[in-house]
């Protein structure tokens, strides 16, 4: 991410950028930062966008070969094309001879690092992963936004807020906006405010169900199950998520019995 910001700051751009990973909010932010730095907002003549797995490579190449109209650059944005998991040999070949005026921006959720397109972008530009952020990073980010609005919150209430919203930054941003509007005119955000306006995510209800089951709180577990059904969550998915979490708990218990350290447990269970 810092490399993209440095390119924008120095105005020394690469010819290809790949933004990939699970954190859609950050990908969206950096996609727009790049686009706005490369072209004026109203320059629609030199900006083109392709989306989806039906994107036709010959059309992309034809457009790429078109000189920019009264501008220094032509920018082509390609989103969720699947080119980085499936074969896209014609485009991978073309990556070796991009016109000087061209900048390609690819946005994908999943990539195969053995893929020719991934290697081509690495050679010609930058491949940047936008992974889910850890709790410490999210907490710092949210506190920064609260501070700008003159708001204060205790650490415990901040943890409750993140537990309620989950780790998706897009959802956190939306819930925070609701919270800031609700507490307008007050300096301190409380747990009562969070409970009043913030929506609990489905995955968090799953964790609450697990806690209720392990604590033998049958009524609470059933209430949470009904909440999930009301949210149109399929019963088989609920069962799958519960089974997966209990399986993880069992693995952790067994590894602790073997006196494994936290790093080993994280590696073996895939919780890194």
Predicted regions span which residues?
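Conserved beta/loop motifs at nucleotide-recognition and modification sites
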Residues: 1-272
């Amino acid at each position: 991410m810092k490399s993209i910001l440095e390119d924008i700051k120095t105005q020394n751009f690469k010819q290809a950028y790949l933004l990939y990973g699970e954190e859609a909010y950050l990908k969206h932010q950096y996609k727009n930062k790049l686009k706005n730095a490369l072209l004026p907002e109203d320059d629609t003549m030199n900006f083109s966008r392709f989306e989806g797995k039906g994107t036709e490579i010959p059309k992309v190449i034809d457009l790429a070969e078109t000189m920019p109209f009264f501008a220094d650059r032509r920018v082509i944005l390609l989103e969720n094309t699947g080119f980085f998991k499936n074969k896209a040999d014609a485009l991978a070949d073309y990556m070796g001879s991009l016109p000087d005026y061209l900048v390609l921006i690819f946005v994908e959720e999943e990539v195969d690092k053995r893929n020719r397109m991934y290697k081509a972008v690495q050679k010609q530009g930058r491949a940047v992963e936008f992974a889910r952020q850890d709790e410490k990073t999210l907490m710092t980010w949210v506190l920064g936004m609260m501070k700008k609005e003159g708001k204060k919150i205790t650490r415990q209430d901040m943890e409750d807020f993140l537990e309620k919203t989950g780790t998706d930054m897009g959802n956190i941003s939306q819930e925070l906006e609701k919270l800031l509007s609700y507490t307008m005119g007050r300096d301190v955000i409380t747990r009562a405010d969070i409970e009043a306006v913030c929506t609990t995510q489905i995955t968090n209800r799953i964790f609450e169900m697990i806690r209720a089951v392990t604590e033998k709180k049958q009524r609470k577990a059933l209430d949470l199950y009904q909440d999930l059904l009301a949210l149109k969550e399929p019963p088989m998915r609920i069962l799958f998520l519960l089974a997966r979490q209990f399986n993880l708990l069992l693995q952790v218990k067994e590894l602790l019995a073997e006196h494994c350290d936290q790093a080993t447990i994280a590696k073996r269970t895939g919780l890194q």
